Amino acid sequence: DKPIIAKTLYVTPQNETICQTEFTSEYYLDLLDKNYPSKPLSEKKGIVYISRSKLPAINCLLGEDYLEFYFKKCGAKIVHPQEISINEQLEIYNSARCIIMLEGSAYHTFQLLGRALGDIMVIERRSHNGNFPWCQSFIEPRCNSYTFYTDYNEGGGENYLKTITQKNN
């Protein structure tokens, strides 16, 4: 609630833009890693589903309540980012072995992290007509693995969840 006075303010050149097709630079990710150190992959645990179900209906996916039910049944923690602080989001994302989400603005929080993410699975919610999913260029360099699902019938997400939950039990 009060202004912050700094003796020195460091500003890095803008390194990420909407619709970029080049991956985020290693230099920029190094700066972010210094600011928010990543937990080792071996310490990351659990599955997180970032939900849009409590947003206005125009921003949601029809049937997302079912996805939440399914992911919760598989042991996933359901997160509604608009209900928690940025710091809580960063801690949850840095600690998760796997993050599953519908594409949307919630993944901009990832841009505050360097290479702190485990496995990321993004489910398409709007058509890209075969174009490069714009989030890939800044998510992929930050995570252990990145999968962008454009077909809900692929079954990969279900198989992945079974593998993760079996390893955690």
Question: Where are the language model's segments positioned?
Answer:
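The feature primarily captures lumenal catalytic ectodomains
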Residues: 1-169
